[in-house]
């Protein structure tokens, strides 16, 4: 869900330390969710999620996976319905088959009834009651894990150690975060790690001698700005509503 990221998410400071005892609530809540019986569906499932609260590049990766697989399989993207995420839902619907319901399990049952062969879930790693065939955790290479604390003291939805239960990590963004890569590799040696960068596909259609208004309505505004600056865009004004 969309939110304005607190400044204290980035580094350990007085506010994050004061809120640290409240992370016990998140830890206990996560522990209870792990007790859920995992349900297996008659469809191959790929979950692309994150443990960092914020834009980590999930949706572009979901669309890319769908684009590759739909050449050979009947694919569908599943996204849990939130009223404040209609923009993302529209993007997914324009580029793929989409089932968007308030319950992921019901969405998967719907996909099975419609004879889809592969379901790609946009978010859902914290849905412990589903037995995914492949689970992928996304990170932004610059933000990494922020101050490293669980919510509400930090940006983590679950402990970094949960990566040992997942199949792959995608580190998305401009920064080559070697330090964070080393941390990930220590958690699970056989974890597949992929590094990606954002590349504009229509760069030639822009006049880089002109000034531009920076407008971001979804995703990670900081990463979007870094990408524009990398490709020499002159940003005159900024407007961020994501």
PLM features: residue spans?
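A transmembrane-helix-recognition feature enriched in membrane-embedded lipid enzymes
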Residues: 2-44
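C-terminal accessory "lid"/substrate-recognition subdomains
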Residues: 2-5, 144-242
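Residue-level signal for inorganic ion chemistry
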Residues: 25, 59, 92, 122, ...
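Walker A (P-loop) phosphate-binding motif
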Residues: 34-84
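Short, highly selective alpha-helical patches that border small-molecule cofactor pockets
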Residues: 58, 62, 85, 89, ...
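Rossmann-fold NAD(P)-dependent oxidoreductase module
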Residues: 64, 68, 122, 227
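Conserved beta-strand elements of the Class I
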Residues: 76-78, 137, 212-215
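Phosphate/Mg2+-binding loops and adjacent switch elements
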Residues: 83-188
